[in-house]
Amino acid sequence: MYCPFCQHDHSKVIDSRVIDAGSAIRRRRECSKCEGRFTTIEKAVLLVVKRNGVTEPFSREKVVTGVRRACQGRDVSDDALKRLAQQVEETVRSNGSSQVRANDIGLAILDPLRELDEVAYLRFASVYKSFDSADDFEKEIRLMRRRGRD
């Protein structure tokens, strides 16, 4: 890390703190040459591999936006959506890879969304799983009821 004041390439860490709900680390550093102090933020980048092969950084906000559409008209708070997005990010990061397929993000959304709101779950699942008929909805509802009894 280069010092922003004198461009020296060595500094020591004075303080480290976890920020952004554990997704980043804030480090306070001191240059070993000029003793200038500066802050760095380190974040592990998680890349999403889309169906067409293009990659982009993971975005909790995209998860919230997608789920919010499914929750439209439902009594689901923004805080609940943010918690769900955090849970999804934790799930996809837990595999230890720096890349995740977009399809895996959709799978990671399904279970917590079903627990949050069943109607929103059905709406999201109908798009994610490409439902073609009312029969698809009926099958999914039967699956939900079976899982509810387990």
From Swiss-Prot:
Cofactor: Zn(2+)
unnamed Zn finger ranges: 3-34
Function: Negatively regulates transcription of bacterial ribonucleotide reductase nrd genes and operons by binding to NrdR-boxes.
Classification via Pfam families: ATP-cone, Zn_ribbon_NrdR
Annotated ATP-cone domain residues: 46-136
Family the UniProt entry places it in: Belongs to the NrdR family.
Cofactor note: Binds 1 zinc ion.
Encoding gene, per UniProt annotation: nrdR
Organism in which the protein naturally occurs: Corynebacterium glutamicum (strain ATCC 13032 / DSM 20300 / JCM 1318 / BCRC 11384 / CCUG 27702 / LMG 3730 / NBRC 12168 / NCIMB 10025 / NRRL B-2784 / 534)
Matching InterPro entries: ATP-cone_dom, NrdR-like_N, RNR_NrdR-like
GO terms classed as biological process: negative regulation of DNA-templated transcription
GO MF term set: ATP binding; DNA binding; zinc ion binding
Keywords from the named record: ATP-binding, DNA-binding, Metal-binding, Nucleotide-binding, Repressor, Transcription, Transcription regulation, Zinc, Zinc-finger
Protein name (record): Transcriptional repressor NrdR
